């Protein structure tokens, strides 16, 4: 059995971002955790999917959320 695709997604928000962003993130299939953070990024989501296509699909859903400005995907290597 192949390993799951795992990634940390760092998210930059627009000022007009949704107040329930974390709840919207956690509702997306494949997202294991999400939270607002301080620093150069505004939020993060940890993602686990069966394959790269699932990871891409999850990332597309994150980017479609109102107020998401940009994302940075950090794939795990081990």
Regions found by a protein language model. Give the residues of each.
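A compositional/biophysical signature of low hydrophobicity enriched in polar/charged and small residues
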Residues: 1-78
């Amino acid at each position: 059995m192949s390993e799951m695709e795992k990634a940390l997604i760092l998210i930059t928000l627009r000022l007009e971002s949704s107040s329930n962003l974390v709840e919207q993130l956690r509702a997306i299939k494949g997202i294991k955790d999400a939270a607002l953070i301080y620093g150069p990024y505004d939020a993060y989501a940890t993602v686990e999917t069966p394959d790269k296509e699932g990871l891409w699909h999850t990332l597309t859903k994150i980017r479609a959320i109102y107020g998401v400005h940009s994302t940075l995907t950090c794939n795990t290597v081990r």
